[in-house]
């Protein structure tokens, strides 16, 4: 049989290794020969040795695939033309792009948390001129955003960022998202009208529980003990920092169990909604052959189905806000006039339109950032980023903000709760060190 180039390569490397072994008593355990700018996806060549023998082997290691592991956000690793692997050492390993990926998620989470703080603060400021028209502001954020999202989607399509394949993805998941969001809104509004603010804050922490549960069921994701404990501490920290000393327990006794269960059901629907969006992104990667679905495709189609469902529920929702359905058109007209601060009949709208417009812009930026964080990491990470914004916003309300008048005081357990929250975040992000043997890079599980 004719000698192939592979045979010559093995023979040459064996001879070279023999000379290296004679020079050093403790040879390196592994050497990676990486072909940069590989052609036709040829796998890199890895040279391995065993601790117990002097035999060296050459084997081809296929490029690492994207896979769902136990870490949120670690499963989707960007492919790059140049891959740098660990060389030598006792089983040390590195995944190309992992550090960059982690930094991207950290920056996105911090941005989402900051926008979440701004969203909460500006919402309270926007309600100062619109204190008589909160239902108008809620419907503006539902109906008005559809036009904005589809306008952005149109321009992105014309620019070639959004493709026809992206627009042709199945619409049933978006319908499910719209139904979940509208039902969550209706259930939440009905329960919130009978619960106190601190009670709602306590019950809202079940949102994270539902997300973890749905991620395990529908995404097959596994969480480490430190991640579960970290999420628990984050939720407990928010409860301590915001609701401590506010009579939340007494409020639960006064309102009964029915409204509390309805609020928990509302957060169940919201948890299912965010996990469903994560499913949409993961499924679209398969349908688009690795391409990433544009954010505004999800925002636009999800919003239009939500608007349809909200329109069907308007008689019920307006009644919850104490507005007879036959008076809804005049209420919307007056709310719009107050939003723009026009008309002599409308009074008490000082601060409009600046404050409401600032809230609308901040709210859109927050929603987009939240969806992007779901896309690049997971629904649970996005929930943690949103949860962190709660105590920070509470602290901001103690500052001398314009239009708010006398600043509020910090809750009694704010500092202790914030410390618990930070410890929970650090515990969730902590990755336990694992002892590995001779492997250069771990093989991804079969998909």
From Swiss-Prot:
Q: What InterPro entries does the entry give?
A: CRT-like
Entry keyword Metal-binding: no
Please give the start and end residues of each transmembrane region: 103-123, 135-155, 172-192, 200-220, 228-248, 256-276, 304-324, 351-371, 387-407, 413-433
Keyword rRNA-binding listed? The answer is: no
Describe the function of this protein.
Involved in thiol transport from the plastid to the cytosol. Transports probably both glutathione (GSH) and its precursor, gamma-glutamylcysteine (gamma-EC). Exhibits some functional redundancy with CLT3 in maintaining the root GSH pool.
Gene name linked to the record: CLT1
Question: By what name is this protein known?
Answer: Protein CLT1, chloroplastic
Subcellular location(s) per record: Plastid, Chloroplast membrane
The annotated phenotype of a deletion mutant is: No visible phenotype, but resistance to L-buthionine-SR-sulfoximine (BSO), an inhibitor of GSH1. Clt1, clt3 and clt3 triple mutants are more sensitive to Cd(2+), have a decreased level of cytosolic GSH, an altered systemic acquired resistance response and are more sensitive to Phytophthora infection. Clt1, clt3 and clt3 triple mutants have decreased lateral root densities.
Q: Where is the transit peptide?
A: 1-48
What SUPFAM superfamilies does this protein map onto? Multidrug resistance efflux transporter EmrE
GO cellular component labels: chloroplast membrane
Species assigned in the record: Arabidopsis thaliana
Which keywords belong to this entry? Answer: Chloroplast, Membrane, Plastid, Transit peptide, Transmembrane, Transmembrane helix, Transport
**Recorded family membership:** Belongs to the CRT-like transporter family.
The record gives the membrane topology as: Multi-pass membrane protein
């Amino acid at each position: 049989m004719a000698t192939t180039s592979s045979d010559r390569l093995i023979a040459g490397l064996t001879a070279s290794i023999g000379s290296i072994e004679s020079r050093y008593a403790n040879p390196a355990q592994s050497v990676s020969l990486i072909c940069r700018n590989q052609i036709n996806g040829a796998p890199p060549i890895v040279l391995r040795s065993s601790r117990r023998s002097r035999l060296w082997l050459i084997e081809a290691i296929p490029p690492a695939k994207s896979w769902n592991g136990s870490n949120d956000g670690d499963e989707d690793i960007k492919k790059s033309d140049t891959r740098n692997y660990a060389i030598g050492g006792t089983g040390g390993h590195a995944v190309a792009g992992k550090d960059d990926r982690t930094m991207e998620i950290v920056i996105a989470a911090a941005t989402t948390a900051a926008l979440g703080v701004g969203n909460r603060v500006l919402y309270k400021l926007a309600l100062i001129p619109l204190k008589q028209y909160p239902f108008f502001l809620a419907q503006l954020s539902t109906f008005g955003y559809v036009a904005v999202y589809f306008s952005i989607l149109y321009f992105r399509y014309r620019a070639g960022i959004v493709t026809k394949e992206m627009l042709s993805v199945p619409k049933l998941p978006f319908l499910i998202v719209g139904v979940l969001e509208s039902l969550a809104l209706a259930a939440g509004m009905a329960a919130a009208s009978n619960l106190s603010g601190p009670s709602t804050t306590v019950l809202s922490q079940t949102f994270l529980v539902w997300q973890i549960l749905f991620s395990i069921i529908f995404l097959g994701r596994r969480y480490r003990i430190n991640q579960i404990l970290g999420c628990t501490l984050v939720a407990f920290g928010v409860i301590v920092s915001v609701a401590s000393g506010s009579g939340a327990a007494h409020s639960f006794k006064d309102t009964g169990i029915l409204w509390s269960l309805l609020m928990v059901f509302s957060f169940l629907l919201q948890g299912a909604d965010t996990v469903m969006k994560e499913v949409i992104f993961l499924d679209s990667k398969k349908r688009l052959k690795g391409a990433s679905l544009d954010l505004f495709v999800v925002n636009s189609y999800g919003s239009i189905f939500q608007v349809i469902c909200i329109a069907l529920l308007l008689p019920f929702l307006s009644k919850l806000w104490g507005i007879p359905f036959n008076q809804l058109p005049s209420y919307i007209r007056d709310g719009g006039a107050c939003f723009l601060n026009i008309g002599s009949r409308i009074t008490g709208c000082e601060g409009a339109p600046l404050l409401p417009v600032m809230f609308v812009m901040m709210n859109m930026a927050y929603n987009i950032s939240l969806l992007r964080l779901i896309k690049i990491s997971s629904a649970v990470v996005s929930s943690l980023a949103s949860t962190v914004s709660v105590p920070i916003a509470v602290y901001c309300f103690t500052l001398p903000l314009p239009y708010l008048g006398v600043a509020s005081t910090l809750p009694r357990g704010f500092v202790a709760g914030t410390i618990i929250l930070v410890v929970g975040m650090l515990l969730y992000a902590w990755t336990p060190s694992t002892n590995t043997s001779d492997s250069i890079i771990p093989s991804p599980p079969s998909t």
